Amino acid sequence: MADPVSVIEIWGGEPLSGHIPVSGAKNSALVVLGGTLLCSQTCRIRNIPDLMDIGRMTNVLEALGLKVTRDGSMLDVDGSHVSHSKAPYDIVSKLRASFFVIGPLLARLGVARVPLPGGCAIGARPGELHIRGLQALGAHVHMDHGVVHAYVPGARGKLKGAK
């Protein structure tokens, strides 16, 4: 016999209907926010949780020249004026997800300078996997005094597909 606590029985024979709001997922939202660097127009993103890490990522984007406006759980991110390729240490040091801006900066500007990220220190999570991925796409990447310097060589300065 099953434990009565682990069983849910529904009686009544009536169809169920309705809506259950689901909160946004922070880690997914951080990746999407980094991806807004690829857009030269305004991106509207819905169901974004109002959390400290989301605020830090929007601060990183604003420091790079994007304009971010929040209305409840919706963010408008205007990427028409990306003006910097270097993310500021004082913000990046508090957020591991800030590493997600390197690829979009390389794709958009051909260059990125991002300090090694900080944030939640649950185990060692070096950026080596990201760096190898960027190198596979044709970027030249090196570290200097805790800052990842990446650029795309050549006159066109575009990333290429990996094999």
Name each model feature, range by range.
Residues 1-163:
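Structural preference for solvent-exposed beta-strand-turn elements
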